[in-house]
Amino acid sequence: MEKFGMNFGGGPSKKDLLETIETQKKQLLQYQARLKDVVRAYKSLLKEKEALEASIKVLSVSHEADVGLAGVQLPGLTFPDSVDDRCSTHSEDSTGTATSLDTAASLTSTKGEFGVEDDRPARGPPPPKSEEASWSESGVSSSSGDGPFAGGEVDKRLHQLKTQLATLTSSLATVTQEKSRMEASYLADKKKMKQDLEDASNKAEEERARLEGELKGLQEQIAETKARLITQQHDRAQEQSDHALMLRELQKLLQEERTQRQDLELRLEETREALAGRAYAAEQMEGFELQTKQLTREVEELKSELQAIRDEKNQPDPRLQELQEEAARLKSHFQAQLQQEMRKTALAEDQLRQQSQVEEQRVAALENQISEVSELLGTYEKAKQKDQLAIQKLKERILQLDLENKTLALAASSRSPLDSHGEESSLDVNVLKDKMEKLKRLLQVAARKSQVTLDVEKLCDLEIMPSSEAADGEKATALYYQQELKQLKEEFERYKMRAQVVLKSKNTKDGNLGKELEAAQEQLAELKEKYISLRLSCEELEHQHQQEADDWKQELARLQQLHRQELERCQLDFRDRTLKLEEELHKQRDRALAVLTEKDLELEQLRSVALASGLPGRRSPVGGGGPGDPADTSSSDSLTQALQLAAANEPTFFLYAEQLARKEVEITSLRKQKHRLEVEVHQLQDRLLEEGERHREEVAALQSHIEKNIRDQSREGANLEYLKNIIYRFLTLPDSLGRQQTLTAILTILHFSPEEKQVIMRLPTSASWWPSGKR
């Protein structure tokens, strides 16, 4: 219940109860100690009071005795000397008592000042000895002055004074003893408090020293950790700088190795070319004929190879097709994944929409239940008000009937049968008429209150009777009064029965109202339980939706990570393939260039041979040889063969140039295709980034929607917010009739802010119906 911000029980928790029990135990112990101190002080004060009362009693008795003794001795004395002696004796007694009191006060003061140095309680009695001596001296002087006539009285007086002195000394001793005991207890408490203060100060000093030591240790540890962190930071910085230097050196070494490798490759190519030239020059003259035949065969083979190369070049490259297929497959894969993600987001949106609809339906159901509860409470309040009005009317009716019963009882008691006989014998007609007038007025008042028509006009007829028929009138009035008394008794019985019926109906109505109130309370408790169960189910659904949203977030992050990894892998594959294709193109170019250089050299050699063989053929016609000469035929055959070779080898340059141009075109097309693929990869990356951004926006929108649902569930939706505003306007109205039950029912669901409560509490009519427990 505490999780929902509600406490239907209204009681504190177990921890608070235990804390209150502990504090009350401590307070009880303190109160017990204080009570013991108070009892001890009260006992000492009682002892002092008893001692002081005894001393006061003794002093008062001594004074009365002195006065009585003086009154007894004055008639029997004839000499003024004896009067003077007695006066001196009395003055000596009074001075003795005064000195004794002064000595007692001085003793108490000295005891209060030096109670620690002198604790003996028996130090007070010495002053009474001197006083007793003075009393004895005064007694001797009085006895010597008075003679045997006052000897017995003086002895009695001396004995009485001694007893008074003993009581005074004992009371003084008790007072001084109590004072000394109080002083000793005070000093002991003071010493104990000083000792406690010293112990507390020592403990505080020890605790302060310990805390200072711990603080110093912690400061040293902090300094050590700071120094260690600084050294570690310096070490890390040094390691980073060393690693950077090592990387630079390794990069330099790698660059040097690359340059050396390139130089070695160039040298190797040069040496190869030199060796090929030397071997070709050495073997040129030896295998000319064999080379011509081989060259012809090689030319044919080269023609066939060139034709095959042309056919292959005309056909599309399978690697390029594989790359295009791979790119298309990746595109389709990414599009399928994007569509799948879009479907998932659409499903999530549908689920959230359905959930929001379900929540709205629940909120509407809760609003309907709240409206039903408010209507039910309104009907109960109206019925209660009607019942209260009926009860008030019945109470007024009962009070009216009580008043009527009282008046009738007074009237009946005023007319008893014994009194009627006495009045008939003692009263006359005028007195009876006056009483009849009074009874008539009482009957009229009772008739007006009870709404019962009584025949009061007969009394008026009695007044108009003649004086000659007075006796008959008196008899008629007596009979009429008896009948009226019977009617009044019957009316009183009817009123009593009616009052009993009214009380029974009131009790039954109160019972029915109590049952209806209990039923309403049970229904309210059931509604509270339903509200709590609905709140719990809403929280469970909220937790489930939050968990589903977290799962969707994790799935989205995982898919994004997979897409990034797959994109990086595809980029690496494309780079590797492009590098391999470039290497193969370079190798093929090198091979084609080497073959073309060899063929150029062979063609140059053939041309030189053809030119050398063509010179003697031109000279033979000058020598007069016929056409049938075999030398001429051989030379012409060789020339035609050379020309045929030259004619056959001349298109190779054009083929080479065409092949180079075709290769350049293919290279440019491959570069364009590579550039296009890179552009497509960049577009895919941009699209993935856009999709990721869109997914993030959708996730943010879904999160905001979930938070909105959570806020709506926490306040039971915007409709309940609207309901709260309406109730707030209703509460600010000046009319306060029937708001208590509705407010207690709604405050279990809605929570007002402190500002709203202050605004409501500022109103003058809100203090009567605002509940004290909800302020």
Curated annotation (Swiss-Prot):
Q: Which UniProt keywords apply?
A: Coiled coil, Cytoplasm, Golgi apparatus, Membrane
Which InterPro entries does this entry report, sorted A to Z? Golgi-autophagy_related, GRIP_dom
Q: Give the transmembrane ranges.
A: none
Q: Where is the composition biased (Low complexity)?
A: 94-110, 133-147, 629-638
Q: Where is this region: Disordered?
A: 84-153, 614-639
Q: Which domain of life is it from?
A: Eukaryota
Quoted from the entry, the domain comment is: Extended rod-like protein with coiled-coil domains.
Q: What is this protein called?
A: GRIP and coiled-coil domain-containing protein 1
